[in-house]
Amino acid sequence: MAVSSCQSIMSNSMTNISSRSRVNQFTNIPSVYIPTLRRNVSLKVRSMAEGEPKEQSKVAVDPTTPTASTPTPQPAYTRPPKMSTKFSDLMAFSGPAPERINGRLAMIGFVAAMGVEIAKGQGLSEQLSGGGVAWFLGTSVLLSLASLIPFFQGVSVESKSKSIMSSDAEFWNGRIAMLGLVALAFTEFVKGTSLV
């Protein structure tokens, strides 16, 4: 609609402009339908202030000394608060570490569980009972410490985020892997055998 009206305006040449005063020159619509902008000549503006206007006292200001009434300029850019490196802050319920660590462990655990299940045909419960608990605990401690070291140095996950390997992608992949592990365990429990 807007394109066609612009094209019709542009296609009309200046020679086709009519000299009629009751018709809009560009759209050929009678001016009865288009609101006009008329000036109200009788409009007067007056002040509603009470009393006499007060004159400001003139005080000589020395240009070398700053006045007390001038505000101090605030910097335009303020740094974000630095991330806390205390263990209790990192591992708090809303801290940066717990969900990252659990997500990373779930990603490794889901891939490892599915790999063993495809290769050997063992379910998740068989993997844990056949010596998998020691591997699980060792891997969990190692990856948890490896995830905590950058946090203790004050490095946030978002500062090291890149376009493809972004922190949001890791966050969502970890959540999906956690759901995948729970779904794998639940499916094997209901089914009674391994998934594959």
Curated annotation (Swiss-Prot):
Coiled coil: none annotated. Its main location: plastid. Keywords: Chloroplast, Membrane, Plastid, Transit peptide, Transmembrane, Transmembrane helix. The chain crosses the membrane at residues 105-125, 132-152, 176-196. The keyword Transmembrane applies. Induction: By light. Residues 47-81 are annotated as: Disordered. It is found in: Plastid, Chloroplast membrane. One of its GO terms (cellular component) is chloroplast membrane. Residues 1-48 form a transit peptide. Residues 47-57 have a biased composition (Basic and acidic residues). It is a multi-pass membrane protein. Probably involved in the integration of pigments into the mature pigment-protein complexes. Belongs to the ELIP/psbS family. This is Early light-induced protein, chloroplastic. It comes from Pisum sativum (Garden pea).
